[in-house]
């Protein structure tokens, strides 16, 4: 999903930069507030960031100018919400661009918008809806992680289609082409990623269920019930 350095032409890379900055700034505010009020969650923040880094670094060649890989944002989205997830994603994307030749600086805004903003926001909305409907937490976590990945690639395909419309076919034709290529790798990758994140949540709930209550992810009764039953 990382679009390579210099691949997006102007004005598209500038547009994605401008659109991503306000969300990132709000995420910084939310992160600072959370750490001041609940410093005990710092280990979970670190783990969530590490999950994003490790999974999103497992890249496979895909569409010209981009790659396929898990995004790893599902865990952070559920624990901390999409705004803070955008900050963790930004840190990972910047490190990868500077030291791993994965992504780029001019394309940083586009990559952050897809992996760190729109994907997490859509997934978070689905997660909250499922929890309101009393869907099992582990099922909700699996669906959330899957959608965070898939939506990211829909956005990346849209970004590439807008920058490189097909002739003939225009933006729509280009979008279908990009989505078709991404789907080959991303459908199975997202399912594997979601399975891993769901297993991680099972461990976190057993070891740090109290922190999930502190973060308002689950209630005390939900944690007790999940500990007593198998997912």
Swiss-Prot record:
The keyword Transport applies. Keywords: Cell membrane, Cobalamin biosynthesis, Cobalt, Cobalt transport, Ion transport, Membrane, Transmembrane, Transmembrane helix, Transport. Pfam families: CbiM. It comes from the Archaea. The chain crosses the membrane at residues 9-29, 41-61, 74-94, 107-127, 135-155, 181-201. Part of the energy-coupling factor (ECF) transporter complex CbiMNOQ involved in cobalt import. NCBIfam families: cbiM, PRK08319.1. This is Putative cobalt transport protein CbiM 1.
């Amino acid at each position: 999903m990382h679009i390579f350095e210099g691949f997006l032409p102007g004005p598209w890379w500038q547009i994605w930069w401008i659109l991503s900055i306000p969300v990132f700034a709000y995420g910084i505010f939310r992160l600072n507030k959370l750490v001041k009020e609940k410093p005990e969650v710092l280990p979970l923040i670190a783990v969530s960031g590490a999950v994003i880094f490790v999974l999103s670094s497992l890249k496979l060649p895909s569409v010209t100018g981009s790659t396929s890989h898990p995004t790893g944002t599902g865990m952070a989205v559920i624990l901390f919400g999409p705004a803070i997830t955008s900050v963790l994603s930004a840190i990972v994307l910047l490190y990868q661009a500077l030291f791993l030749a994965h992504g780029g600086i001019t394309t940083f805004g586009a990559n952050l918008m897809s992996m760190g903003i729109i994907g997490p926001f859509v997934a978070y909305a689905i997660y909250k809806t499922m929890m309101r409907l009393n869907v099992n937490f582990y099922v909700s976590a699996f669906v959330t992680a899957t959608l965070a990945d898939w939506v990211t690639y829909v956005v990346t395909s849209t970004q590439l289609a807008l920058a490189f419309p097909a002739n003939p076919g225009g933006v729509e034709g280009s979008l279908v082409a990009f989505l078709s290529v991404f789907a080959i790798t991303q459908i199975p990758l997202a399912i594997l990623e979601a399975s891993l994140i769901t297993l991680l949540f099972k461990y976190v709930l057993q070891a740090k269920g109290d922190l999930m209550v502190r973060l308002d992810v689950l209630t005390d009764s939900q944690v007790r019930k999940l500990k007593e039953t198998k997912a």
